[in-house]
A protein has these predicted regions:
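N-terminal assembly/interaction segments in proteins that build large macromolecular machines
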Residues: 1-202
Length: 202
């Protein structure tokens, strides 16, 4: 019936009724029809920008999963998917975004799982960043609001040093979003521009 179909797919009342009618009451065929139409709708949504989202991670792994609204960013299924992707990276050994997208997640790939949830939720969802390191690492996740999952994440790979210092460095990176790691990396023209600005505003 309609309720059973909605429970199985997360589809709206009208979509579920329409699918059951088209499938002539066949529950499995109705699920298939809803999945096809949902994935088609998800494909149409990919031109909408996913600018909200969350970060998730564990030892040596950090990911960013994007959605269109912070409403979806709070969704338990969305947060759960982010955690599952982190576990998929840990299991597969994927080191970058492309390898992660094709990593197995249940009976599908990570990318297929993201597309499937996008079809259910009705928003463009996208795995946008993946970092995975084997050395000593420190993970810092920051919440912009108490009712939201972490939306800023920093994964620092380091050699030597103490955990307190590394934690402070990670917090500084989260707060300031630095472009360069060391003074030597900063191009001379950038230094000159900053000097001119500082002199003009002094």
């Amino acid at each position: 019936d309609v309720k059973k179909l909605r429970d199985a797919t997360g589809a709206g009342m009208m979509d579920a009724k329409k699918a059951l009618t088209e499938a002539e009451g066949d529950h499995e065929k109705a699920i298939e029809l809803l999945r096809i139409s949902g994935l088609a709708k998800a494909a149409k949504r990919t031109d909408r920008e996913a600018t909200n989202g969350i970060v998730a991670g564990r030892d040596g792994i950090l990911i960013q999963l994007a959605a269109e609204t912070d409403f979806v960013a709070k969704n338990a299924e969305f947060v759960g998917l982010a955690d599952q992707i982190v576990e998929a990276i840990a299991s597969s050994g994927a080191k970058d975004l492309e390898a992660t997208k094709v990593a197995p997640l249940g009976s599908a790939t990570v990318q297929e799982a993201v597309q499937s949830l996008a079809a259910t939720i009705g928003e463009n969802l996208s795995l946008v960043n993946v970092a995975s390191y084997d050395g000593d690492t420190h993970l810092y996740l920051h919440r912009r609001a108490s009712d939201l999952p972490p939306q800023v994440g920093v994964l620092v790979e380091y050699t030597g040093g103490d955990e307190t210092l590394v934690h402070q460095v990670a917090m500084h990176i989260a707060a300031m979003s630095p472009v360069y790691v060391s003074r030597e990396e900063v191009p001379a023209e950038v230094v000159e521009n900053e000097r001119r600005i500082a002199e003009a505003t002094a």
